[in-house]
Structures are given as structure tokens and as C-alpha cells.
């Protein structure tokens, strides 16, 4: 830990004295932390080896691999490129729509390259149809969710990377369900293709005037605008605006960095130029983590200009041990050091996510401590995004009071740490941050 702090270039400041700290809530209130045989918080970093894998899909392969497979099938390699155009640019897997392919080859190509991955079970709309939560059934019956949001000048998709989550965070509905399995590269990518298909069909409505005004009030630094630099300038909504997903946030179900290889392959498929991939901007992609420190440093070294978000939720280990069980493995300062390493390596500003929980982590001294720790490592490298805690089933915890949230933000901004309260799109349909649980009822 000390070595990591030295590498980051600054020591962590001392915490306030114990006398200056109000007691946190009793550890047993609301939940009991599951522990392993050694008494450590029970975490799932990997899926069972007995889990059946999804069928291989075009999106699992590079263009060269698709061409090679087509040739193995006795089909000219350029047909794989044509098929890629249909999937990544026309968002279709229907052979009837692929009229540029010989009729004798269409069914065979679709069967081999485009097996069905996500079957829509249900969609729920809110925000006058500008937000849609999808429930998908995967090939093995596992359920995942994604949330599509149209803002006035961008379209954002919150995607899942795992079926469930093994991080066991008590205030997150996904974390309380445990980990079923990792999603494949193609299952991750197919969420975007399916969303683009919905947009192309005109099934995602425009935001209403109030939402446009509220986003303008945030100066482009609300829910996801801050994550895609250069794409968050407020303007009036135009029907001629974006007609496909431009922003991706890995903030759905799962811990993305616990499924590192498949998530990174999915990111590459997103940014690969069409028809090899979706041709998206890497700057519009955000990966969030609860703090898997070695993976954060590995991500920094990937040389991809994506945005990184650290779900911190408490600046002190006393509380973070309770809220974020992985803090037992890597402490708060180690996670912040890794986030700072990401900034120094990539030049990309880091986001700190912080769910404000009433009487738990919203104390003024915690805002001050957070500011001290961030400023000790430098200025201009980080933006804090507090968000009111979203309700989850059976939780006794609630969101902070508005005046408490305002004071928390005031202290951070006053200390020179750029801070903006995040939007809570999708809360009414359990589609907001921490609410995704993939339940059919």
C-alpha cells in the first residue's frame, strides 16, 4: 500500500481524530455480511468452471477470424465482411433482410455466425418514453438488464457485464443476488446492437422539456454527460440528433473488471471501425469498478482513451469495509492511488462515484476527508459524482436529505474538487444505479 502511494506521488492525509467522527450505524443494521471460512467478506471473483459457455458469435471474433471461419465453411471470405455490415451497421440478424448475400448461403451464415444471444423478456418505460429498461434472457436462461436513455444531444446505454455480481455490496440489488456467470464478449456487445435496433425503429422517445431544462442546469455534468468529454454541451433537443447509442456506461449488472478479458474484447469491438465493429468513440465509454486495484492498473496500461469511474462511497476504511466488501482486499487509499495512476497514465480525468446514504456516509467530515485525499494527489485529475441512494428491496438504508447533499457538494466544490450531483434516470422502474436485479415479476 505504501509503495502504491509512493508511486502515485503523494501520501494520503491522516483521517480526522476519532473524537471528530460520529459513529457509523451498527454493523448488523439492515444486513449481515457473508464471510468465508477465514472470516473475510465473501466475494466471487470468478465463475464456476462448470458453467456452460454461450455459442460463439460473430461479435466474439475479429474480422480476420470471421473471414477464416467463412473459408472453412467453403464460403468466400468477403461474405463474412458483408455479414458484419448487416450486424454492426444495419443491426439485423434476419437473413431475409440480407439480400446482397446469395440465398443459398444466408441461412448457413446466420446459423454459424449469428446465433440468438439475448431474447427480450420485458421492457419498461419511464421519463415519457425517453428511458427504457430491458430485461433479457440469455441462452441458458440467465437474466440480465440494460437501460437505454435518450438525452437532448446524446443517447446512453447502461450495460451489464455479468449475470449477477460477486462483490456483495449491501446497498446494491445486483450485489445481493450473487454471481451466476460472466457474460461473453458477444452478449455484452449485443446489448448495444439490440438498443440501436430499438432506436432505428423509432421506439425511444424524445426527452420532455423539463428533462432538457434539468440537464442544462447540470451544465452537461449530470448522469453520463461528464463521462463523455466534449459531448455534454447543453442544447435544445432536435429530432435530427443522434440516432444510435453514442455513450456506453458499464454500470449495469456485474463488476466489469472481474470479467476483464471479455469486457476489454467487447470494448475493442465497440471502437473497431465498421464493419469490424460498431465504430464508436472510446471517449464515450465508461468502465466503473468498486476497486479491483490490479485490474485498474492493467486497464490504465491498455492505452485506450476510455473514461474510468471508481465507486468509492466512503473515504475511510472504517465505513468502506462495510459498504464495499472488496475493501477488505484493497483499501480506500490503494483504490484512489490506482485511480490516480489511471489519470497519470492516460491523461483522462477520473470520476469518483459516491452514493449518498442517510447518516452513513454523508457527514461533513467525510466530504472534507474525501477532498483532502483527492487533493493530496493533485488538482484537476478527478471529478466527484455523488448520487442519492436509490431504493432497493428490503433495504433499511435511504437517501440523504436534500440539505445534507447540498452541504456535501458545497464542501467538495469549496475545496476545489469539481463535484456534480448525478441524475437518477430510471428510478421509477428500478433501472437506476444499484437497482438492477433482473427479476421477472
Could you say what each language-model-derived stretch is?
Residues 126, 160-161, 288, 311:
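Short linear Ser/Thr-Pro motifs
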Residues 199-205, 235-420:
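Conserved AdoMet/S-adenosylmethionine-binding subsite of the radical SAM
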Residues 150-201, 209-210, 214, 218-233:
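Canonical Radical SAM [4Fe-4S] cluster-binding loop centered on the CxxxCxxC motif
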Residues 1-155, 208-236:
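Flexible, acidic/Gly-rich N-terminal and inter-domain linker regions that tether
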Residues 422-427:
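Acidic carboxylate-rich catalytic motifs and surrounding loops in phosphoryl-/glycosyl-chemistry enzymes
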Amino acid at each position: 500500500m505504501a509503495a502504491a502511494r509512493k508511486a502515485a506521488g503523494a501520501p494520503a492525509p491522516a483521517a480526522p481524530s476519532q473524537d471528530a467522527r460520529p459513529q457509523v450505524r451498527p454493523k448488523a443494521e439492515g444486513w449481515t455480511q457473508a464471510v468465508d471460512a477465514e472470516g473475510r467478506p465473501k466475494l466471487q471473483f470468478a465463475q464456476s468452471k462448470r458453467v456452460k459457455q454461450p455459442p460463439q458469435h460473430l461479435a466474439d471474433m475479429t474480422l480476420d477470424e470471421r473471414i477464416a471461419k467463412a473459408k472453412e465453411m467453403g464460403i468466400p471470405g468477403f461474405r463474412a465482411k458483408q455479414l458484419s455490415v448487416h450486424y454492426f451497421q444495419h443491426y439485423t440478424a434476419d437473413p431475409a433482410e440480407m439480400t446482397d448475400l446469395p440465398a443459398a448461403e444466408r441461412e448457413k451464415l446466420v446459423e454459424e455466425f449469428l446465433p440468438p444471444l439475448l431474447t427480450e423478456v420485458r421492457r419498461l418505460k419511464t421519463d415519457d418514453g425517453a428511458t427504457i429498461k430491458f430485461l433479457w434472457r440469455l441462452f441458458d436462461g440467465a437474466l440480465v438488464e440494460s437501460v437505454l436513455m435518450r438525452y437532448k444531444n446524446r443517447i446512453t446505454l447502461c450495460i451489464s457485464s455479468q449475470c449477477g455480481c460477486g462483490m456483495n455490496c449491501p446497498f446494491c440489488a445486483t450485489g445481493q443476488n450473487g454471481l451466476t456467470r460472466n457474460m461473453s464478449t458477444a452478449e455484452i456487445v449485443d446489448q448495444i446492437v439490440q438498443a440501436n435496433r430499438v432506436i432505428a425503429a423509432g421506439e425511444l422517445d424524445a426527452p420532455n422539456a423539463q428533462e432538457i431544462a434539468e440537464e442544462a442546469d447540470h451544465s452537461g455534468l449530470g448522469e453520463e454527460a461528464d463521462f463523455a468529454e466534449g459531448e455534454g454541451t447543453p442544447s435544445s433537443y432536435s429530432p435530427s440528433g443522434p440516432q444510435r447509442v453514442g455513450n456506453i456506461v458499464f454500470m449495469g449488472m456485474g463488476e466489469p473488471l472481474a470479467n476483464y478479458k471479455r469486457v476489454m474484447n467487447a470494448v475493442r469491438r465497440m471502437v473497431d471501425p465498421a464493419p469490424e465493429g460498431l465504430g464508436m468513440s472510446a471517449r464515450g465509454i465508461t468502465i466503473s469498478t468498486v476497486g479491483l486495484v490490479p485490474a485498474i492498473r492493467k486497464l490504465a496500461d491498455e492505452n485506450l482513451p476510455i473514461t474510468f469511474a471508481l465507486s468509492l462511497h466512503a473515504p475511510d476504511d472504517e465505513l468502506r469495509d462495510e459498504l464495499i466488501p472488496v475493501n477488505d482486499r484493497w483499501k480506500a487509499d490503494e483504490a484512489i492511488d490506482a485511480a490516480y495512476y489511471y489519470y497519470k497514465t492516460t491523461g483522462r480525468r477520473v470520476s469518483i462515484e459516491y452514493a449518498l446514504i442517510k447518516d452513513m456516509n454523508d457527514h461533513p467530515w467525510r466530504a472534507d476527508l474525501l477532498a483532502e485525499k483527492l487533493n493530496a494527489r493533485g488538482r484537476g485529475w478527478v471529478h466527484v459524482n455523488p448520487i442519492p441512494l436509490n431504493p432497493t428491496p428490503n433495504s433499511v438504508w435511504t437517501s440523504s436529505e436534500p440539505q445534507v447533499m447540498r452541504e456535501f457538494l458545497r464542501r467538495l466544490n469549496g475545496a476545489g474538487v469539481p463535484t456534480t450531483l448525478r441524475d437518477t434516470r430510471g428510478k421509477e422502474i428500478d433501472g437506476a444505479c444499484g437497482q438492477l436485479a433482473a427479476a421477472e415479476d
